[in-house]
Amino acid sequence: PTSFAAIEAAIDKLHNPPSMYGFVAPNKVDENFMSQVLEHVFLANGLSPVGSDGFASLDKQKTVEVLDFYKKIATASPPGELFWKQSREVYFAGKAAMIIWSPFILDELAGLRDSAPPTINDDPTSTELASKTGIVTTFGGPSNPSGAAWADIRYFGVTSDANTDVATQFVEYSMKDGYTATLSIAPEGKFPVRRGEVTDTAKYIKAWSKLPVGVDRKAPLS
């Protein structure tokens, strides 16, 4: 489902606790994970506190739509305090129909990490849950049908007291000849902001898509 309405309809169809919860949404307000998920829901409905002139006030109707939707998915979630760990565990046990999580979940979902295995069956290396999981990268609310994704861009910073010549060489290497190696550090959680070079505009996209992921076992990203 790629819209608030479609997700709500799926919850109405699939929510059957305690054997199956329609959703597992974070509710632990002092965890950054909930902030990220809630921000994604705000963006999905076309809301951001940042405007061209700095701070932008939130539209009341759009905000109410966001909060009503979040209340719906939170109500369809298991009881108790939920953040990244619990939400992943509930989904991996096959007890939740839907979850909002970062792509860092992908290698674990595929049974490639022993410390966070799928528990939907007795085989911690099983790809059964992965085969039954669909990935949605963007979704939209009633005030923003085109939807939005959530991401953060990572930057290199060079301090004023650093060896700036050496640091500059490292940054240049990391963003060019070493860019694929940079992406190879947990590639399931990254997406290349540099898609390629002039001579091959998809060079880094293609290289990234084939990088191995996993902790205790490896598999190609695609």
Enumerate the predicted regions with their spans.
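Glycine-centered hinge/linker elements that transmit conformational signals in sensory
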Residues: 8-13, 17, 52-81, 124, ...
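Short helix-initiation/N-cap motifs at beta->coil->alpha
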Residues: 2-8, 79-93
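Non-transmembrane alpha-helical segments in soluble domains
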Residues: 8-15, 39, 67-74, 88, ...
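Extracytoplasmic/periplasmic solute-binding protein
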Residues: 5-55, 96
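Paired acidic/hydrophobic, glycine-rich loop segments that form the ligand-binding mouth/hinge
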Residues: 22, 97-102, 108-109, 117-120
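Structural recognition of the beta-strand scaffold that forms the well-ordered cores
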Residues: 22-25, 97-101, 134-137, 156-158
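Short helix-loop capping/hinge motifs at secondary-structure junctions, enriched
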Residues: 1, 48, 76, 161-167
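C-terminal lobe and pocket-closing loops
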Residues: 108-117, 121, 126-128, 141-222
